Amino acid sequence: MAAPLALVLVVAVTVRAALFRSSLAEFISERVEVVSPLSSWKRVVEGLSLLDLGVSPYSGAVFHETPLIIYLFHFLIDYAELVFMITDALTAIALYFAIQDFNKVVFKKQKLLLELDQYAPDVAELIRTPMEMRYIPLKVALFYLLNPYTILSCVAKSTCAINNTLIAFFILTTIKGSVFLSAIFLALATYQTLYPVTLFAPGLLYLLQRQYIPVKVKSKAFWIFSWEYAMMYIGSLVVIVCLSFFLLSSWDFIPAVYGFILSVPDLTPNIGLFWYFFAEMFEHFSLFFVCVFQINVFFYTVPLAIKLKEHPIFFMFIQIAIISIFKSYPTVGDVALYMAFFPVWNHLYRFLRNVFVLTCIIVVCSLLFPVLWHLWIYAGSANSNFFYAITLTFNVGQILLISDYFYAFLRREYYLTHGLYLTAKDGTEAMLVLK
C-alpha cells in the first residue's frame, strides 16, 4: 500500500504547489470560510513583525496564535509554503497508519465475537471482511489530502492545518496504545485551540480497552489508569504553557489566545454560529449567551461517553465533528478533518437515511458562500442576513449528517445482536426507531 499512498501524496503536493504559484493564492488567503481571526496567516506575519521589533506580538488585538507557533515560523518563515504542505502530508500519513491499526483491532474483535456466538444468526451480510477493509486507510488519506476544504486551508496557510496534524498524531498514538505520547499530543492540540480537551474522554476509553481494564466506577484499576493518564496530560500541558512563558517572559498569551477563543470579541464573519448573534445582541446579554454557545462543545461529551464507551473511535469521530461545528472560530479546514473519517464508516452507508440530500446541502452551501459574500460586501445587493442564512444551513446540514451517522451506527450495533429481521410480539414486522 506504500506506492498508492506515495502517489496520493505526490498528487496532493503538486496541486498545492500549483495553487501556491497561481493568482488564486492571495484570493483564497482572504476568504472568511478558509481563515479566521485565530488562524489567519496575515495575522501570524503581523505577530512576527512585532516580535522582530522587540514588541510583544500580543500587545495589540491582532495576533491570537500560541507562542510556539510564532517561534516556529520565526525560523521557518521563508519555507512557510513547504511547512504547510508537509503538515498536510503528515496528517494524512498519521491517519493512514491509525486507521490501518484500527481496522486490525476491529477485525480481531469481530472474529472473537463470532467465535463466542455473540452475533445474531442472520447478520452475515453485516459482517465486515478483510477485502472490504483493505483500502480504507488509503481512502482516508485520499479524503483528507484531496478534499477541497483541506487544499484551500493549506493554500491560505491557515494554522488550522497544524492543529489537524496534532489531532491526527493524537489519534495515531492512542490507537497504537502509547499512553505517554497520546497525552503529549492531546496536550499540544489543547494548547493550540483549547477545544480538543473534549477528546480526553474517547482517548482514555480507547486506552482502557487496550489495557483490558473494564470501565467500571468500582474498579480500582480503572481509577488508577485514569489518574495516570490525566496526570500525564495535565503535566504535559503545564510544561508546554510554562515553555511558552519562558519564550516570551510574559503571560500575555493566555488572555490573547484562550480568552479570545472563549469570549469571542472579534465578530468577523465566518462559517460558525457565533458572529451574527453577538453582532446583533445587546452588550449586557453577551456574557450569558457566550456561555450558552460555548457549552455546546463540552455538553455532549459525557452522554456520548456513556453511550459509546465500547466504541471510543466512533466517539472520537463524533466529538471532532462537534468541535468543528460549535467552536467559536471554525474554518473549512476543521470540517475536512472529520470528513476524512467517512470511509472508516462506509459499512454504515446502508443505514444512512438522508446522506444524499445532506451532502447536496453541504456542497451547495460551500458554493454559495463566496456568492453571497460578494453580494453583501461588494455588490451591496444583499446583507448579513443572507450570508448568515447560508452559514446556518451549512451547519444544520453538518449536524443532521453527523446525527445520521450516529443513528446508523447504533442501528447496525442493534441488528448485530438482535438480528436484521425484527418482529413485534404479535409476529408482525417491527421497525427500529431511535428515541
Curated annotation (Swiss-Prot):
It is a multi-pass membrane protein. One of its GO terms (molecular function) is GPI anchor binding. A cardiolipin binds at K216, K309. One of its GO terms (biological process) is attachment of GPI anchor to protein. Pathway: Glycolipid biosynthesis; glycosylphosphatidylinositol-anchor biosynthesis. One of its GO terms (cellular component) is plasma membrane. Keywords: Endoplasmic reticulum, GPI-anchor biosynthesis, Membrane, Transmembrane, Transmembrane helix. Residues 23-78, 245-286, 373-384 are lumenal. It comes from the Eukaryota. Residues 1-3, 100-136, 206-222, 307-311, 346-354, 407-435 are cytoplasmic. The chain crosses the membrane at residues 4-22, 79-99, 137-158, 159-178, 179-194, 195-205, 223-244, 287-306, 312-331, 332-345, 355-372, 385-406. A 2-acyl-6-[6-phosphoethanolamine-alpha-D-mannosyl-(1->2)-6-phosphoethanolamine-alpha-D-mannosyl-(1->6)-2-phosphoethanolamine-alpha-D-mannosyl-(1->4)-alpha-D-glucosaminyl]-1-(1-radyl,2-acyl-sn-glycero-3-phospho)-1D-myo-inositol binds at N383, N385. It is found in: Endoplasmic reticulum membrane. Heteropentamer. Part of the GPI-anchor transamidase complex, consisting of PIGK, PIGT, PIGS, PIGU and GAA1. Belongs to the PIGU family. Component of the glycosylphosphatidylinositol-anchor (GPI-anchor) transamidase (GPI-T) complex that catalyzes the formation of the linkage between a proprotein and a GPI-anchor and participates in GPI anchored protein biosynthesis. Binds the lipid portion of GPI-anchor. May act as an organizer in the transmembrane layer to recruit other subunits, and thus is essential for assembly of the complex. This is GPI-anchor transamidase component PIGU. It comes from Cricetulus griseus. The lineage of its organism: Eukaryota, Metazoa, Chordata, Craniata, Vertebrata.
